[in-house]
């Protein structure tokens, strides 16, 4: 992944691990499947375009995955999908939130049906998490296809103002329907919020991460856990009337 990180740095962007570190408590991230790769070609990159693992936010457990847009455009392949599924299986087992940092072009064309099958497996794991633990999607960059229709089925979607979400792009729509539509009209974050697919639009990814941290501070880790307690500061926890 060194080449990937150099490529991201040259583009002036943050790496998936930097994004995860900005979201989670400092030093809490434990990576899963770092050496996973697609067999058959020794040049296939380790990690397969996604970073997965678990950590904490305000001391509470979360599972997180982040797309690496410099590896096959962040598209979903077999090893990629298996890594995300393993992370989600952990969230189901322990009952904790799942946070996806999405920056992907969707399915990996060269993997054909296998890529689509991985989306099916990811979606199958969203079902037992629904109503059990919060599922949150953070949208960064230009996201298309499965990198959009999977996130919109999660509980909360947070997007940066320069991100885009569409099932297919303007060129395909133009060739199929003859309709001219701009990328802004089709899938800008503001438009997606108007459509009801995005809950909050952040100025940048760091505001998005801060928003998600604050959002989780209001939510229980799972349906089996009590909601977090907040101290309003309006009155002491124990008053004279309580003692009388």
Please annotate each region the language model reported.
Residues 102-224:
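Conserved catalytic cores of soluble enzyme domains
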Residues 223-244:
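Long, low-complexity segments enriched in small/aliphatic residues
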Residues 5, 13-16:
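Long amphipathic alpha-helical segments
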Residues 8, 91, 192-193:
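Generic structural signal for hydrophobic
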Residues 19-136:
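Long, structured ligand/cofactor-binding scaffold of large enzymes
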Residues 14, 29, 221-225:
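Intrinsically disordered or highly flexible coil/loop and linker segments, enriched in small
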């Amino acid at each position: 992944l060194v080449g990937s990180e150099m490529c991201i740095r040259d583009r002036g962007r943050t790496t998936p691990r930097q994004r995860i570190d900005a979201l989670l408590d400092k030093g809490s991230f434990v990576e899963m499947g770092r050496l996973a790769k697609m067999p058959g070609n020794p040049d296939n990159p380790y990690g397969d375009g996604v970073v997965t693992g678990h950590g904490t936010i305000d001391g509470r457990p979360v599972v997180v995955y982040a797309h690496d847009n410099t590896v096959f455009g962040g598209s979903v392949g077999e090893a990629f999908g298996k890594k995300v599924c393993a992370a989600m299986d952990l969230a189901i087992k322990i009952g904790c939130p799942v946070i996806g940092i999405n920056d992907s072009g969707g399915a990996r064309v060269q993997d054909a049906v296998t890529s689509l099958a991985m989306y099916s497996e990811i979606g199958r794991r969203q079902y037992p998490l629904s109503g059990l633990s919060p599922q949150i999607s953070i949208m960064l960059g230009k996201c298309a296809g499965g990198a959009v229709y999977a996130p919109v089925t999660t509980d909360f979607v947070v997007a940066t103002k320069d991100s885009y979400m569409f099932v297919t792009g303007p060129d395909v729509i133009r060739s199929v329907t003859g309709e001219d539509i701009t990328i802004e009209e089709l899938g800008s974050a503001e438009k997606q919020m108007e459509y009801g697919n995005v809950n909050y639009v952040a100025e940048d990814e760091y505001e998005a991460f801060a928003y998600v941290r604050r959002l989780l501070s209001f939510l229980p880790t799972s349906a089996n856990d009590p909601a977090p307690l907040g101290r309003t500061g309006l009155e002491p926890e124990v008053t004279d009337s309580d003692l009388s």
